[in-house]
Design a protein with these regions (language model features):
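Glycine-rich, often proline-containing surface loops adjacent to acidic residues and nearby aromatics
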Residues: 154-167, 278, 463-467, 504
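Extended, folded cores of ATP/NTP-driven motor/assembly subunits in large transport
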Residues: 1-235
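Gly/lys/ser-thr-rich phosphate-binding loops in alpha/beta enzymes
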Residues: 70-96, 298-326
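A generic structural motif
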Residues: 2-10, 106-108, 189-202, 329-339, ...
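A short, charged
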Residues: 279-303, 645-668
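P-loop NTPase motor domains
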Residues: 94-99, 191-192, 203-258, 264, ...
Length: 668
């Protein structure tokens, strides 16, 4: 079939090297670590020890112990719904669903099939001859005949097989529970649990990698290849990504931390062709919680993160970063009556205005000056371009000029008019007084004089964590377009100037508003080109209708997002066919997604999330964090208010407030 291949282990992989343990060393120490410590083996009355660990062995070595029927896979009810099947291998109960430390040893002995069948023919004849003396001989003959008929009619290969489960613990009491757990899991397969105490040393010896030749033949049973393969385990536990970059998630079954790279390693392997991400999760599914968890770890690994939000989801994290960096980072832009949002588009820290900075200033002035349905003439564009260039030249020459919109306005009013007069520029080509009149609300004393005249010398290029909170202005026809241009300019500036540094722009629900305000082309440009600048664009949405109704989402965002992240979709289970078709999900991926949060461990507090990479790799992980992280990310208003009050009480020390709040909750 090509789905399974065998790879011969090298000598170093078997016996190890000076720095890395081989598979034999790992087996003898019951460890998967590359620096395994060899343990003493000791045999006692009815028991065997490896180091401090006592072994417990269950075997499937007798046909009477086997299930009445086997299959390649079975439906796992706990993670299945009436609209989806979660399929696991038949032997999954002793594999990934058995949560203690254990090894499953499976043997297939490919003997001479024809010789085996001849022996069975002879045995059947003997049984027939002796059937008059014992009914059991007659019954055995019938079983052998049935085996032979199956082999000849279907052309099956006769083989011998064996399966055993070797578990261990350094605590005898715990080992008793483990023994019961293994027995219960075997019973789930409808097999008869057989706890083997006599043959433990022999079977342990035979299971040494490469030593199956010493396997005791009497411990095997005859079957066919097809049936024996049904005892193979098709699942594995979660493995850490072999990459220095990534985020920390959790194994959904065991709670074990997993290092997961969803950006660099998949790009290197060719699993994905871009780092963009599309995140879908209804309200309350833990969507913002997961994105907080993700961007914090990206930020801590050197990424420049720019977030556009409409719900204060990242306020706690931003405030924490702001406090930790003593105000150097964690910049939070939001609009409030007593503290309105303010920028200074004319300020750059290094004093260098490159072409893109000049173009962004011109675009900003044009947005203030002209309506969407009122394009500027060529003469107006030239006049404005000259005005911007001359003003920036004045700033470069004269350090006493403070760059701001106010000084730009005064330059147009007091100096640029004379220049236009000298050039004999006609009023109909550029109406300077009309221009000043339209821009007056943004000048000193005007209604929006705060907007472009910030006195904070803030260069966003070198700020690594920036949040634009647009909830209060997303419907404001004056403020919203200006802020979106600032956002656009900020990220493009980072994209082009920060060579070799990872950049991420994350658009929460704000993408809907942005896509309406002439920013649709920017989104298209962003998603198609950001990968060339070691960047990634992330869109987060919660409504299925948003995906279905938006041409930008369907045509640009989804098609250019090789990493898709979905949270609990049970709310949309009746609409999931549309989601599946739109995202191009396979039936297996559908089953994985609909299994999210179906069988959560009540003793742990976590939400599950599905991650799909390039349509070829996918898995469900858990977002499980400490109480400290929880209170940093929470979007529950009562919890946020509790944290804010404690922060104020502690003089603005949010980190200490988080620690105290988490500690108080643990003690309850």
């Amino acid at each position: 079939s090509g789905f399974i291949t065998l790879t011969r282990l090298t000598g170093d992989e078997i016996t190890g090297t000076e720095s890395t343990a081989g598979i034999i060393e790992k087996y003898f120490s019951l460890s998967q670590e590359n620096t395994a410590c060899l343990q003493d083996l000791s045999l006692g009355a009815g028991e065997m020890k490896v180091g401090d660990n006592y072994l417990c062995l269950h075997t499937l070595s007798d046909p009477e112990d086997l299930p009445s029927g086997v299959a390649t896979d079975t439906r796992y009810e706990r993670l299945s719904t009436d609209r989806s099947d979660c399929r696991l291998s038949f032997a999954a109960p002793i594999g990934i669903l058995l949560t203690c430390n254990h090894v499953v040893n499976q043997y297939l002995f490919i003997d001479d099939s024809a010789e085996n069948l001849r022996k069975f023919e002879q045995t059947a004849r003997n049984m027939h001859s002796l059937s008059r003396y014992s009914r059991s001989n007659q019954i055995n003959r019938e079983w052998i005949e049935e085996y032979l008929n199956e082999a000849h009619s279907k052309g099956l290969t006769s083989i011998r097989a064996h399966c055993n489960v070797m578990a261990w613990s350094d605590d005898r009491e715990k080992l008793k529970r483990i023994k019961n757990d293994v027995g219960s899991q075997l019973a789930l397969m409808e097999a008869k649990p057989r706890h083997n105490t006599v043959d433990v040393p022999t079977l342990f010896w035979a299971a040494i990698p490469g030593n199956a030749g010493d396997f005791p033949a009497e411990e095997s049973f005859y079957t066919f290849i097809e049936q024996a393969l049904c005892l193979f385990i098709g699942e594995t536990s979660y493995k850490d990504s072999l990459s220095p970059f990534g985020i920390r998630m959790v194994d959904r079954l065991t709670g074990k931390p997993v290092h997961l790279d969803i950006s660099d390693l998949p790009m290197k392997n060719g699993t994905i062709t871009n780092r963009n991400k599309f995140i879908l999760g209804p309200s309350g599914s833990g969507k913002s919680f997961f994105t907080n968890h993700m961007v914090r770890q990206y930020y801590e690994q050197g990424t420049h993160v720019l977030l556009v939000d409409t719900g204060n989801s990242y306020q706690g994290l931003c405030n924490l970063i702001h406090a930790r960096t003593h105000g150097e980072d964690g910049i939070y832009f939001t609009y409030e009556e007593n503290d309105p949002i303010a920028f200074n588009p004319f300020y750059v820290e290094d004093g260098v205005f490159d072409i893109e900075k000049k173009e962004s200033i011109k675009t900003l002035i044009l947005t203030l000056w002209k309506r969407d349905d009122e394009p500027p003439t060529r003469a107006e564009e030239v006049a404005l371009s000259n005005a911007v260039n001359l003003f920036l030249e004045n700033i470069r020459r004269d350090n006493s000029i403070r760059p701001s919109f106010n000084t730009f306005y005064e330059f147009i009013r007091d100096e640029y008019q004379d220049i236009l007069r000298e050039k004999r520029t006609r009023e109909k080509d550029f109406d300077v007084w009309g221009f000043l009149n339209v821009l007056e609300p943004y000048y000193r004393g005007g209604e929006y004089d705060f907007l472009l005249n910030s006195d904070k010398q803030l260069d966003l290029l070198n700020k690594r964590f920036i949040v634009f909170e647009l909830d209060n202005i997303k419907d404001n026809k004056v403020l919203f377009p200006i802020v979106t241009i600032i956002i656009m300019e900020t990220f493009i500036n980072k994209m082009r100037k920060l060579k070799g540094i990872r950049k991420m722009i994350l658009l929460e629900e704000a993408w809907k508003a942005i896509s309406k305000e002439g920013m649709a082309e920017y989104l298209r440009y962003l998603f198609k080109t950001v990968r060339k600048f070691f960047g990634e664009a992330v869109v987060v949405t919660q409504e299925v209708e948003d995906i279905i109704s938006s041409s930008i989402v369907k045509g640009t965002i989804i098609n250019n997002s090789d990493c898709k992240i979905l949270l609990d979709q049970r709310k949309y289970v009746n609409k999931f066919d549309e989601i599946q078709a739109l995202l191009g999900l396979t039936d297996k991926e559908r089953a994985q997604i609909l299994s999210i949060n179906m069988a959560n461990n009540p003793s742990r507090k976590y939400k599950e999330v599905w991650v799909g990479l390039g349509g070829s790799q996918s898995a469900v992980y858990a977002t499980e964090v400490s109480l400290e992280e929880y209170y940093c990310y929470t979007t529950e208003e009562t919890e946020k208010l509790e944290l804010m009050r404690l922060t104020e009480k502690l003089g603005g020390n949010i980190e200490l407030a988080i620690k105290q709040l988490a500690e108080s909750k643990r003690e309850k």
